[in-house]
Amino acid sequence: MASIHIETTGNGPDLVMLHGWAMHSGVWDGVVESLSQRFRLHQVDLPGHGASRDCALDSLDQMTEVIADRLPGRYSVCGWSLGGQVAIRLALQAPERVQQLVLVASTPCFVRRADWPWGMEDSTLTLFMENLARDYTQTLNRFLTLQVSGSEDQARVLAWLRKSILRGQPPTPATLQAGLKILQTSDLRAELNQVSQPVLLIHGRNDVITPAGAADWMQQHLPRARLVLFPHCGHAPFLSFPEQFVSCFDAL
């Protein structure tokens, strides 16, 4: 198996940065300069993404295990969306290594269920999987549009996301379909109360991919959680409000 790509910059306590589905570690570029003045950042390309493109993406547990082998002995972790689920898994699998979590626009369960109203329709994710094989570019564009929905600066953030994807070699359709399958099937709700570390939840109030109700639920069920809600913000608060996003790390 090819190795995971990690870019390390800055000085200070170790902070691991995990991006979301279909993206790569460069998505954090707008906040790296500020954060690297306070932390030693480890920007990870998830399996099948970015410079880790040749590393197979199989499951949430596989992602966690492959990444954990490359991380410092002790670290905090910031995960966006799918990266947030990887962060939760890291904290559960090796609590002695993970000091704190920052979960950005994340959720324990991406799909709406009878007892979980704060998710996407299962049929929507299935349609994304089917359409990736038919029209890769258009399907990615549709997902990026969902990410910026609800933001007051949708055009700017959408342009930035599109530019960010083009900066690296995009994931294969098979990788993206495998990632969507993880989003469709993973449900960490029953395990969430076992996360003993302090958790900072950063969420956009208008997020349509991981609705803010999911963040409220996590705050209630995580033993040591604090929630920061960004108004007029969708699924990418670190792109819509980079300065405010960085200021949230003052509490770490």
From Swiss-Prot:
The active site is at S81, D207, H235. Keywords: Biotin biosynthesis, Cytoplasm, Hydrolase, Serine esterase. SUPFAM superfamilies: alpha/beta-Hydrolases. GO terms for cellular component: cytoplasm; membrane. The keyword Cytoplasm applies. It holds the Pfam family Abhydrolase_1. Substrate binds at W21, S81, L82, F143, L144, T145, L146, Q147, H235. InterPro entries: AB_hydrolase_1 (IPR000073), AB_hydrolase_fold (IPR029058), AB_hydrolase_sf (IPR050266), BioH (IPR010076). The keyword Hydrolase applies. GO terms for molecular function: pimelyl-[acyl-carrier protein] methyl ester esterase activity. It is found in: Cytoplasm. NCBIfam families: bioH (TIGR01738). The physiological role of BioH is to remove the methyl group introduced by BioC when the pimeloyl moiety is complete. It allows to synthesize pimeloyl-ACP via the fatty acid synthetic pathway through the hydrolysis of the ester bonds of pimeloyl-ACP esters. This is Pimeloyl-[acyl-carrier protein] methyl ester esterase. It comes from Nitrosomonas europaea (strain ATCC 19718 / CIP 103999 / KCTC 2705 / NBRC 14298).
